[in-house]
Amino acid sequence: MKKIFLILIANFFVCSLSNSQNSTSSPYSFYGIGSLNFKGTSENRAMGRISVYNDSIHMNFRNPASYTGKNMFSFNNEGRLVKFTVGLGHSETDLTTSDNSSKATNTSFDYLGLNIPMGKFGMGFGLIPHSSVGYKLQSSNQDNLIQYKYSGNGGLNKAFLGFAFQVNNNISIGFDTRYNFGNIENIA
């Protein structure tokens, strides 16, 4: 019971942090819901953003069928009841115009997930930032009499819950349900 309580508190802490973070400094985040974030894990990125793999030690958000299947087996003869994954990201951006240049550094929460295999079934849930907004733009008219300033911050997050079923040793099927939430603030 204590472990479940600690997991719920950690989940609440990460959710509150992810709702208030700003993980981009891109002027392109001015448009729409902002810059879209990659929806996978560091293993997906390291393999060229592949999303069809399945193994016994990694969680794959991009393929809900991977919540079951090989992840039910043990790795090095140790039983794994659940798979837990969390990721952080760091980026440095150089912004340059004909007049100015600046450097922006961002460190952010990338993902949190838990996968629970249950016989031929599997369940996964977690939290992934969906988009990020973070910009400060300034321009003026030709006479420099009027200055226009635009700024924005925030983003959308995605909470997901997925289920999978292993049809046979080579085929699994799965689906995710997702809920998007967050706040985007644009100031002109």
What are these regions (language model features)?
Residues 1-4, 169:
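Positively charged n-region of N-terminal signal peptides that target proteins for export
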Residues 4-13:
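Sec-dependent N-terminal signal peptides
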Residues 14-15, 75:
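Hydrophobic alpha-helical membrane context
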Residues 16-20:
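Sec/Tat signal peptide C-region and signal peptidase I cleavage site
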Residues 21-188:
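Subset of outer-membrane beta-barrel
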